[in-house]
């Protein structure tokens, strides 16, 4: 049955109780089922610039599932267990979604708004007891890397920092220029 009108909601709810439905119990299970049903359908798309002809990266459900599984396995390889926290301080990108999904499958995920100030980011890292942080590599016209580095100095619980480079989303000549003007800031922890 499809959902077309608000009254259809009751009909769908009356078909079976939520617990009696054959729904996946985990995020990984939900992604597995979706990729079985729609492997080649578009799942997510990202472009760094919003022009109609600007380069975009689109992932199918199969691609998203494979990359999410790879991210979850990477986090597990870094020692993340079910009760450990993976935090990310990232702008919107495909890597942000992969950090969210992979982190949630491997352990607990803590998204942190990159617009917060250093003290707020540090407080979230401490309060969540984040073990791993995924953040942006130094990039022109953004201070995410710098703020995260300063916050890490106030969050001794973090063991691993991973950096995402948005350079791959750029095309020439911007992709040639960014390495020359990239801020010289390295996250160390």
Protein language model features and the residues they cover:
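Short hydrophobic alpha-helices that are characteristic scaffold elements of the AMP-binding
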Residues: 76, 100-107, 126-127
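AMP-dependent adenylate-forming
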Residues: 4-9, 30-60
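Short histidine/acidic/glycine/proline-rich micro-motifs that form metal-
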Residues: 17-18, 50, 138-141
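Flexible, non-catalytic linker and terminal segments flanking ANL/adenylate-forming cores
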Residues: 1-28, 47, 165
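Structural core segment of the AMP-binding/adenylate-forming
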Residues: 108-189
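Conserved AMP-binding/adenylate-forming core of the ANL superfamily
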Residues: 43-93, 97-100, 117-122, 177
């Amino acid at each position: 049955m499809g959902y077309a009108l608000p009254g259809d909601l009751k009909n769908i709810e009356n078909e079976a109780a939520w617990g009696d439905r054959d729904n996946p119990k985990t995020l990984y299970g939900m992604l597995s089922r979706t990729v079985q049903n729609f492997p080649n359908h578009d799942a997510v798309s990202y472009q760094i610039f919003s022009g109609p002809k600007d380069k975009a990266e689109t992932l199918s459900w199969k691609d998203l599932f494979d990359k999410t599984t790879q991210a979850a396995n990477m986090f597990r390889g870094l020692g993340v267990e079910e009760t450990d926290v993976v935090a990310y301080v990232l702008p919107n990108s495909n890597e942000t979604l992969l950090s969210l999904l992979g982190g949630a499958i491997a352990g607990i995920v803590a998204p942190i708004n990159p617009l917060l100030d250093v003290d707020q980011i540090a407080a979230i890292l401490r309060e969540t007891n984040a073990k791993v942080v995924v953040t942006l590599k130094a990039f022109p016209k953004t201070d995410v890397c710098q703020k995260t580095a300063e916050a890490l100095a106030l969050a001794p619980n973090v063991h691993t920092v991973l950096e995402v480079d948005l350079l791959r989303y750029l095309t020439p000549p911007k992709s040639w220029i960014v390495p020359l003007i990239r801020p010289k800031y390295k996250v160390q922890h």
